[in-house]
Amino acid sequence: HNNAYERLLTVLDMEDIFEENLKLDFIQGRVNYLRKYTHKFYSSSKKQYLYALTLFTLFVENVSLFSQFYVINWFARYKNVLKDTDQQVKYTRNEENIHALVGIKIINTIRDEMPELFDEELEERIRGEAMEAFKSEAKIVDWMINGIKEPGLDADTVKEFIKNRINSSLEQIGFKPVFEVDNELLEATMWFEEELLGNNMTDFFHSRPVEYSKKSQSFDEDDLF
């Protein structure tokens, strides 16, 4: 995935954008919360492992990239643009989901074998981290959406989508959810879950192998969006 996205930045002549974005406070805020799983909070190695695994599974694998996945997939689905990028995002999206499911399975196995590790203090710490994660992700969404208001693509809808992913992640490991979710807004995002979890059928008449265009090819902004 890394090579594909690096290639995409090269095609768009945006090689420096990653380093530039890291200078933004809200981007650095995301980096900081995603690195919390490396911080030591518990003297018990078993509990520290569980804490780190839970943060990594829930937030790195199952939340942090999904607002971006949603936006790219939305443009491909409803505007018929960014098709090559959309295909790469789908590969990444599906693999991140698998990674998260594996992590959740491991966490639940630990719960079965060592239930004493799952005390009230751990749950409240994880739920608190979930709220901090959402605050960081919400700032990313506002920056990324930048005032767009389309059916299924506006800041409020994408934020509800993220809240729901966080709630679902917590519930899958036996913790209480932290957010009230607007089901009416969430309804507009169900296509994403259907694509992610359902069995997709290939349209052999229109689906074809694609490659990123060479950097030498010129692009018009209207062609991309």
Which residues make up each language-model segment?
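Non-heme di-metal
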Residues: 1-225
